[in-house]
Structures are given as C-alpha cells and as structure tokens.
C-alpha cells in the first residue's frame, strides 16, 4: 500500500512527548499572533457542534435528579473536564466496579447502540463522551429508563479527556462513524491521525482494543494506513485488511439503510501490543 502524502506514520505511543500530553487543544495547526503581539495556539477540533431540537425526554434527563448520576460533568458547565482523571473511579460504588472491564466510546451520537451494548454486557462498565447535548440527554434517559448501573456520560472533548487519564487505563476504546472530514483542507481534523492515536494508545491497557468503523471508503483506507503504520498496535485482521462487524457492535438504522443502498461499512480492530 503506498503511503498517503498527508500521513506521517512515524509516531508511536511510547514517543508521546510532554508537549503532546500538555496541549490545551486536541490538535494544532501552528501559532497565530494576536493583536496583543502574543502567540496563541490555533484550535483544530475533530468535531463540530450541531444545533438540533432537544426532545422532552432528553431535556428531562439533563435536569431531573434521578438521572444525575449518569452525567459526570453536567453541572460543571459546557465541556468542562476539570478533575476527571480516573474513569474507573466513576463506578467505585458498584461491586467490582473499579476492577470491571472498561469501555470508552467516543462520540456516541444519540446513544442507541452505546446503550444496547451496555445493556448486553452488564459486567462491563461503559463511559461515553459526546459534545452534542440532545444526544447526551437521550442517552442518559435510555440508561435511566433501563435502570443501567454500568453507564456514565461525559460532555466534552475526548482527546482532552484522554490526556488527563492514566496510562494503561481502558480495556476498549470505540470510535464509530466519526466525521470523515472529506475536504482535503479538513483532513487535519480527522480523529484517526498519528498524533491523536499516540494519545489514544497510551490510555489503552496492554491487550486492549481500539475499534473503529466508517461508511466512507476513502476514510476507511486512510485509517487502515495510519493504524497499520502505528508502532504498538496490531491489526486483528492482518495488515491492510478490515474485519467483519463483530456481534457486540449493533447495526444502526442508518447503517442498515446505507447497506440497503449499496454503501459499504468498514470495521477495524487493533490490539495494543
């Protein structure tokens, strides 16, 4: 496979620098000089907040006390992650809570598949992080109405959260159908990049999984090239290959419609060596 000209795969988890650990943003594209003459880091987000209608159930879950224990930082203000440095501690009150297998899902959307997975594996703890408040509210509402004890929800930037967590902390990190950022000038916003994967991988336990899926073919091959070239991760389907959708990842309505229209879906599972 020839290397994409925009990809530098010469990064690995062990080479994560102090600068990468301490960045105030999830990526940067250089410095800008402000009117005061000082240099400021330009923020490059991997996500874009959407303004959509919030239904009554989602609004209820964001405000009613019976849902509050699902919402880790709902009272902190928009996306404030201050003090969130141990996801296992969020389940400390549960039997074996801090010792149970831990999954982090990045960008769970409206939360349907996230909640379905949590309900199917009650002995595994699930943390979801999202910036879309209607999705956060809906997810919390579903968790509450199903009385799930193994779910926690965080509002904020996943990369910033991962920087705050200990090394070797998470058993499985999931990233399903991330924004493909199709335009070339936006490729720097793609979540799967060597620099961001260094941050992701340091948080994974030895033997932990990074699992991603996309319905954009170009992004699928971009991801397999980045991840196959990343020291410390092993493609479970073999270099250059994709895996079949595992049984534990539910098929969404959107995915079914796409497949019915002839669109492909590509899954990738990588093990931390």
Curated annotation (Swiss-Prot):
Record's function text: Catalyzes the formation of N(7)-methylguanine at position 46 (m7G46) in tRNA.
InterPro entries cross-referenced by the UniProt entry: SAM-dependent_MTases_sf (IPR029063), tRNA_(Gua-N-7)_MeTrfase_Trmb (IPR003358), tRNA_methyltr_TrmB_bact (IPR055361)
Spans annotated as Disordered: 1-36
Active site residues per record: 179
Signal peptide bounds: none
Family: Belongs to the class I-like SAM-binding methyltransferase superfamily. TrmB family.
Gene: trmB
Name of this protein: tRNA (guanine-N(7)-)-methyltransferase
Organism (species): Psychrobacter cryohalolentis (strain ATCC BAA-1226 / DSM 17306 / VKM B-2378 / K5)
Highest taxon in the source lineage: Bacteria
Pfam families registered for this protein in UniProt: Methyltransf_4
């Amino acid at each position: 496979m020839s290397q994409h000209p925009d990809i530098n795969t010469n990064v690995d988890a062990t080479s994560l620098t102090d600068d990468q650990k301490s960045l105030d943003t999830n990526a940067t594209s250089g410095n800008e000089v402000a009117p005061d003459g000082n240099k400021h880091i330009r923020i490059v987000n991997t996500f874009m907040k959407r303004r959509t209608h919030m239904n009554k159930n989602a609004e209820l879950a964001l405000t009613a006390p019976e849902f509050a224990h699902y919402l880790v930082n709902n009272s902190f203000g928009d996306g404030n992650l201050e003090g969130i440095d141990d996801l296992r501690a969020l389940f400390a009150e549960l039997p074996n809570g801090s010792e149970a297998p831990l999954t982090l899902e990045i960008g769970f959307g409206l939360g349907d598949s996230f909640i379905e997975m949590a309900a199917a594996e009650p002995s595994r703890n699930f943390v979801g992080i999202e910036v879309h408040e209607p999705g956060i509210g809906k997810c919390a509402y579903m968790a509450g109405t199903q009385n799930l004890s193994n779910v926690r929800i965080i509002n904020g930037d996943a990369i910033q959260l991962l920087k705050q967590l200990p090394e070797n902390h998470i058993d499985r990190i999931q990233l399903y159908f991330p924004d493909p950022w199709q335009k070339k000038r936006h490729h720097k916003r793609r979540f799967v990049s060597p620099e961001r994967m260094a941050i992701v991988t340091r948080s994974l336990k030895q033997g932990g999984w990074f699992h991603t899926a996309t319905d954009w073919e170009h992004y699928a091959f971009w991801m397999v090239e980045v991840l196959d070239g990343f020291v410390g991760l092993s493609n479970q389907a073999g270099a250059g290959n994709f895996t079949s959708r595992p049984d534990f990842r539910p098929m969404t309505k959107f995915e079914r419609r796409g497949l019915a229209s002839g669109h492909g879906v590509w899954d990738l599972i990588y093990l931390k060596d």
